[in-house]
């Protein structure tokens, strides 16, 4: 809620929504690109990888889904999606210490939430363009704590075209990957 409040009260009046979307996409698309092409991958922890960038210092753990299901009107459909990634980010310069971020590889339906289910416990992530986040730093911490205890995370979302997606991520190596990324950014 705090992140949304900051956006609504401070950022929104300053710039247009299109500018914010462009900035978010540019900023976070570097993570997706780095997952595929970066030579800054420093470690693997089972199903999770750790990346580090310098200047400014950024560290993140990231994973791709093990299973993806796309449906429309209750039927499984084949759709083209970009990178589907789940991150935990650390950026000391910005005082970001464990921010959960998800990209589904498509623009989310406007005003929609992504449902994150960790072993039966549900969490709502707010969306902007192709990205989704927890609503506050406290929510980030609660979700990450649940993920450390869990076996899998299922993210369910709706695209701007009405496609329902369900992405299942393994949490094997999650705890070690997050700890490693955090340590590298201290």
Regions found by a protein language model. Give the residues of each.
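Bacterial N-terminal signal peptides that target proteins for export
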Residues: 6-21
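Cleavable N-terminal signal peptides
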Residues: 21-22, 32
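A generic "folded-domain core" signal
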Residues: 35-186
């Amino acid at each position: 809620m705090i992140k949304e409040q900051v956006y609504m009260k401070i950022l929104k009046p300053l710039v247009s929504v299109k500018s914010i979307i462009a900035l978010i996409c540019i900023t976070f698309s570097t993570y997706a690109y780095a997952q595929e092409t970066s030579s800054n991958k420093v470690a693997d922890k089972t199903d999770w990888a750790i990346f580090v960038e310098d200047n400014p210092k950024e560290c993140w753990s990231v994973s791709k889904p093990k299973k993806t299901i796309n449906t429309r009107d209750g039927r499984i459909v084949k759709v083209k999606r970009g990178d589907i990634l789940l991150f935990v980010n650390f950026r000391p310069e910005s005082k970001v210490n464990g921010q959960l971020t998800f990209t589904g590889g498509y623009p989310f339906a406007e005003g929609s939430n992504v449902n994150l289910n960790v072993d039966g416990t549900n969490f709502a992530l707010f969306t902007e363009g192709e990205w989704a986040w927890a609503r506050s730093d406290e929510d980030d911490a609660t979700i990450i704590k649940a993920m450390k205890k869990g076996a899998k995370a299922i993210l369910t979302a709706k695209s701007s075209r009405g496609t329902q997606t369900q992405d299942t991520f393994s949490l094997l190596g999650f705890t070690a990957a997050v700890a490693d990324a955090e340590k590298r950014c201290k």
